[in-house]
């Protein structure tokens, strides 16, 4: 019997999720993250073999498996309530990783099932840490990615998305000694360099008829979700953050898998 490969589980929202062709060009960074790993040209993609949630996708690489369990509209709260964290826990093994990116939907006061007060964000993230500790796996916290929010700000500047949640996650990671990758900061800096117009190529700005067989066939001007180019750019930023991580050796296995 073949030894099971170590896995990197992804728990998050629509900005991380893998999508089917009918949603093109919408793409989550978790859908293309595998492209930054050694042997990416040999990657086998399939539905996750041991998940009961049909949107879950596995990316089987020579040295590791990326198991994307992210789902649109989920916060750290309703992701857990729906049993999605338990779904990961049921298959997690010693040596695995769990990357956790939430914040976008936690801030949605209009939807009670999603909302988490910033002051309680750490408390809402704790079960993800506990699942990893029980399995002797490594939890990695990731701050929410940037939005194209320049149109809403004076002088067209990009600012951190959901800053109170970013700050709460950073404080929680420090308190619990959890590796943290500040993807929110790094992608905001990327957007600032790319500029307001350039970022339309990263986010889900689509002309009517551009994708006639897609759910976005009528066009879209979406400043939260990503196109393929944006997902690849943001996944590349995450790769850089992993390589630069120097707080301890907990990410060394993943560093060795990156190209």
Give the location of each predicted region.
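Serine-esterase "nucleophile elbow" of acetyl-processing enzymes
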Residues: 1-70, 86-94
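Short, solvent-exposed coil/turn elements at secondary-structure transition points
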Residues: 14, 72-74, 145, 186
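Short, acidic Gly/Pro/Ser/Thr-rich loop/turn segments
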Residues: 16-17, 76, 107, 188
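Sparse, context-dependent recognition of short Cys/His-centered cofactor- or disulfide-binding micro-motifs
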Residues: 18, 51-54, 64, 77, ...
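Acidic/histidine-rich helix-loop elements
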Residues: 19-27, 70-79, 110-116
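Short, solvent-exposed coil/turn linker segments
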Residues: 44, 74-75, 182
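Alpha-helical cap/lid subdomain in secreted, periplasmic
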Residues: 81-232, 236-259
């Amino acid at each position: 019997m073949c030894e099971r490969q170590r896995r990197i589980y992804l728990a998050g929202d629509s900005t991380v999720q893998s999508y089917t062709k009918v949603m093109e060009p919408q793409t989550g960074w978790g859908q293309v993250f595998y492209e930054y790993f050694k042997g990416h040209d040999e990657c086998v993609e399939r539905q996750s073999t041991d998940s009961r949630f049909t949107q879950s996708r596995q990316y089987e690489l020579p040295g590791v498996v990326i198991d994307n369990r992210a789902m649109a509209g989920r916060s750290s709260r309703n992701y857990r309530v729906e049993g999605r964290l338990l779904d990961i826990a049921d298959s997690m093994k010693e040596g695995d990783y769990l990357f956790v990116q939430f914040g976008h939907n936690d801030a949605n006061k209009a939807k009670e099932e999603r909302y988490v007060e910033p002051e309680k964000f750490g408390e809402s993230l704790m079960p993800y840490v506990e699942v990893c500790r029980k399995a002797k796996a490594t939890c990695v916290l990731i701050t929410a990615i940037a939005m194209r929010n320049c149109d809403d700000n004076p002088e067209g500047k990009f600012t951190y998305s959901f800053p109170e949640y970013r700050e709460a996650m950073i404080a929680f990671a420090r308190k619990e000694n959890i590796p943290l990758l500040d993807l929110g900061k790094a992608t905001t800096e990327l957007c600032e360099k790319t500029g307001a117009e350039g970022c339309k190529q990263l986010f889900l700005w689509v002309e009517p008829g551009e994708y006639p067989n897609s759910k976005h066939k009528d066009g879209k001007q979406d400043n939260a979700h990503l196109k393929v180019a944006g997902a690849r750019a943001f996944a590349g930023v995450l790769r850089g953050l992993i390589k630069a991580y120097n707080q301890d050796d907990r990410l060394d296995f993943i560093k060795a898998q990156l190209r």
